[in-house]
Amino acid sequence: MNLSNWNPYLKLDDYGSTCMAQQTYEPLVSPDEKIFCKNYSFPNNYQYMDTSDRPLYTEDVVDWFFNNEVEYLNKFSEKSYAPEVIDIDFKNRKIYLKWYGNSCNQIINSGQEWPQEQWHQQIKDIILDQYNEGVYKLTMYPHCHYIDNDNNMRSIDWYGCVQVNNPYVEEKYMQGIIHETAQFRLEETGKAIDSVLNIETMFKRSLGEHVLWGNQNMSYIYKEIFNE
């Protein structure tokens, strides 16, 4: 598939300005906005938009997250909130998904009318179901979700998953995709032990404090999972 005229996906910050959505792959949207491509080829232009100095962002890092994405896409493929996969190009490390024009981030941060009750329960149901399936999905943000034509919320960015009973990731992989402004998030997990980080701590802090949908954090979901 020729991607030369596809557009990079950019999320909106709190002020409505465009910025990079994540530090892992190149997100591309077809001209008709009906296909979303997750391009895990290395290197790619998108991941050097903010800076050309990313020595920890390596092909090994990109490979690891591509494989993790595919693993959890497959695990959750039958869920109503799973993305509709068109194709996975393993040779070129590209994943093609059916797209509906905007992510939840663009709806919320562009000032569109979207009553909280229309997403509040859906994101809760998604996160609780993932937890009940034994998975922590760190990518809980609005730009990691979208609404299809039936007002059903779907989730992307499955690269950010770990097992609840084995929530450990080598530090080099996390350092490879963390933005300098979010370095404190890794520090909250504590020092790496044998070069491995406990991602459960990061998930809990994200869910309880850091992830925002508009001005609403996810603490109401945190309390239901952890009873804290």
Q: Model regions: which residues?
A:
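Protein kinase-like catalytic core scaffold
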Residues: I35, Y81, I95, R154-D157
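ATP-binding glycine-rich loop module of kinase domains
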Residues: P8-K75
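Hydrophobic residue at the +6 position relative to the catalytic HRD Asp in the kinase catalytic loop
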Residues: H143-I147
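Protein kinase catalytic-loop region centered on the HRD/HxD motif
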Residues: L128-Y136
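Conserved structural core of kinase catalytic domains
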Residues: D60-F65, N74-H120
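C-lobe/activation-segment region of protein kinase-like
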Residues: Y136-K137, D148-E228
